[in-house]
Amino acid sequence: MALQLLPSTLSVPKKGSSMGAVAVKDTAAFLGVSSKAKKASLAVRTQVATAPSPVTTSPGSTASSPSGKKTLRQGVVVITGASSGLGLAAAKALAETGKWHVVMACRDFLKASKAAKAAGMADGSYTVMHLDLASLDSVRQFVDAFRRAEMPLDVLVCNAAIYRPTARTPTFTADGHEMSVGVNHLGHFLLARLLMEDLQKSDYPSRRMVIVGSITGNSNTLAGNVPPKASLGDLRGLAGGLSGASGSAMIDGDESFDGAKAYKDSKVCNMLTMQEFHRRYHEETGITFSSLYPGCIATTGLFREHIPLFRTLFPPFQKFVTKGFVSEAESGKRLAQVVAEPVLTKSGVYWSWNKDSASFENQLSQEASDPEKARKVWELSEKLVGLA
């Protein structure tokens, strides 16, 4: 049966958040798939209950073989935004191996639960937990709830993202930051910083942190040069908090808002953050830090806010003209490779795949690999999420 973490106390999000999801004030662990689990879930408490092990070999323990030799335990991977698209496909690919227990960290708990069922993920192979990256309080609550569940953390995948390509006015997170950068970068930045402690405690032989990038934020590619191009400028907008009230909602400080550029800029921040994690922590901890572009998933729900004509024409254009189209299932397998494959353990790498689906180390643009800019993004982000 699949271990799930259900909210025991719910509240309306803070004024200013447009995500529309309830925020978890406290979280309790329950078994939530079998009929026994449903009965158990009636005993909702405000305190966290430790659920029985959802798998034969607990994600937190190492079993012994008949010969007495220890065998590798199941790995535990947290994937944000795992209720659809790339995240769900990767969760399914990893769960199907039987070697991974997947924590699906999602804003919409019920949607994620239904998606896992619809994808055919086996009971006991996953845990659904509430996480709203548009609220820094929710990020902290998720970390607390995850620790109360007493699972190890072996791999963290920062995948969730929002994309508002036609937006000409900004929306804001519960903390007052522009939504695209707030969710795609700042929420993940806080999550990753807080969970570093858990990654460092893991006894798993190959601990990893994976941050999903995008070709659109990499200006040394054709796609990265499609206007508006990603550019962080001097970061004065980020330094001002991206509030739009007393300054700009754009990272580079531009007074006019462009939703497509805000997304691209957020992905540059993702790739810079990965490299800064690598510089600060890899040598000391041995943790692998990497990013990736799995290919153009032209049918993903990420494009749901684009104009209808684009949604109609973009998939066949990618399939038959650019030849860059990748299905959600294939993209999920590629992300799963970065999570689990022994050959992809090099740290500080931005992974891509060629037309034969072979992985390779891709080259990042100057904008997405500038170490000084990465340091500044890190330090400004620390202030915005309350770590400095």
From Swiss-Prot:
Top-level division of the source organism's lineage: Eukaryota
A family per Pfam: adh_short
CDD domains: LPOR_like_SDR_c_like (cd09810)
Region (Disordered): 48-69
Reactions that this protein is recorded to catalyse: chlorophyllide a + NADP(+) = protochlorophyllide a + NADPH + H(+)
Keyword Magnesium: no
GO MF annotation: an example: protochlorophyllide reductase activity
Transit peptide range per the UniProt entry: 1-74
Biased composition (Low complexity): 48-68
GO biological process: chlorophyll biosynthetic process; photosynthesis
EC number, UniProt record: 1.3.1.33
Pathway(s): Porphyrin-containing compound metabolism; chlorophyll biosynthesis
Function: Phototransformation of protochlorophyllide (Pchlide) to chlorophyllide (Chlide).
Family statement: Belongs to the short-chain dehydrogenases/reductases (SDR) family. POR subfamily.
Protein name stated in the entry: Protochlorophyllide reductase A, chloroplastic
Organism of origin: Hordeum vulgare (Barley)
